[in-house]
Regions:
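N-terminal Rossmann-like NAD(P)+-binding subdomain of aldehyde/semialdehyde dehydrogenases
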Residues: 1-64, 245
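Glycine-rich nucleotide phosphate-binding loop and flanking beta-alpha elements
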Residues: 46, 71, 136-138, 200
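Donor nucleotide-activated moiety binding/catalytic core segment of transferases
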Residues: 49-67, 120-125, 135, 234-244
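Conserved NAD(P)+-binding/catalytic subdomain of aldehyde/semialdehyde dehydrogenases
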Residues: 62, 111-198, 244
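Short, solvent-exposed amphipathic alpha-helical segments in soluble enzyme
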Residues: 80-82, 146, 207
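Hydrophobic packing residues within well-ordered alpha-helices of enzyme cores
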Residues: 101-104, 141, 202-203
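NAD(P)-dependent aldehyde/semialdehyde dehydrogenase
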Residues: 172, 182-189, 193-245
């Protein structure tokens, strides 16, 4: 059955949301659906791998993957890449996403008991590290994993560039790019370039309670400071001629 439609996966969703109250049940289901359709489709995997020439001899290494937890199962693609490349993946889960990632690893083990994936116990040696976190976390990673081959990801921001001729469907898709997962993903749009004179309108949508608390606080702060903004009822649009990321 599809994830979220059986008792076991529904129980996992409930526990994941209890552990991280930024998570929403429907967004967890959507994240799993995206992984199944975009990452685990046989045709798409074969097309992806066809873009790379596999060396005749490829030494197997142990790669520690330090996962973020900002959105559901955000670290899965790193796990997939490590295993697909023929290496062993040690998973250091974020406490914010441990419920879902543990469930997925258990499912992988049931499908293929010999899959080279293990949860990091803090002592197992490794040859390389892939780590995702904030810029501050990256500085810590550089010190912690000095002398080890690393691939480190810090803060990321996504932007949208509009020309004023967007269709309602395109604006609806942009709304999803902005507000899905409460805007916490590195691919969530947080800066929009628009021509002068263009006013943006987005349909109202249900947002996470923690997000709404932040929205109300930011709105109250701007009102107290007299800073202009346009209120969508669930988000603030702030016009600026300069930007800083």
């Amino acid at each position: 059955s599809s994830f979220g439609q059986d008792a076991a996966s529904r129980e996992v969703i409930v526990r994941a949301c209890q552990k991280n109250d930024w998570f929403e049940p429907e967004e967890i289901v959507d994240a799993v659906r995206s992984i199944r359709e975009e990452f685990l489709s046989r045709d798409k995997i074969e097309h992806w791998l066809a873009c790379y020439e596999r060396p005749a001899t490829l030494p197997s290494r142990t790669v520690l993957v330090v996962m973020a937890g900002n959105i559901p199962l955000v670290g899965f693609f790193d796990l997939l890449c490590v295993v697909t490349a023929g290496h062993r993946c040690l998973v250091k889960m974020s406490s914010k996403d441990a419920v879902l990632m543990s469930f997925v690893i258990d499912q992988l083990k049931k499908i293929e008991p010999d899959i080279p994936v293990a949860v990091y116990d803090g002592t197992t040696p490794f040859d390389a590290v892939i780590a995702t976190g904030s810029d501050n976390a990256n500085r810590y990673f550089r010190s912690l994993y000095a002398g080890v081959k690393t691939l480190l990801r810090g803060n990321r921001h996504s932007v949208a560039v509009l020309n004023g001729r967007e269709t309602s469907g395109q604006l609806e898709a942009l709304s999803d790019d902005i507000f899905s997962y409460s805007g916490l993903g590195c691919r969530n749009v947080s800066l929009i370039f628009v021509p002068r004179g263009i006013s943006l309108r987005f349909a109202s949508r249900r947002m996470n309670p923690k997000y709404l608390n932040n929205y109300r606080q930011r709105k109250a702060l701007r009102e107290m400071c007299g800073d202009p903004f346009f209120d969508l009822g669930f988000a603030l649009l702030i016009r600026q001629s300069e930007f800083q990321i």
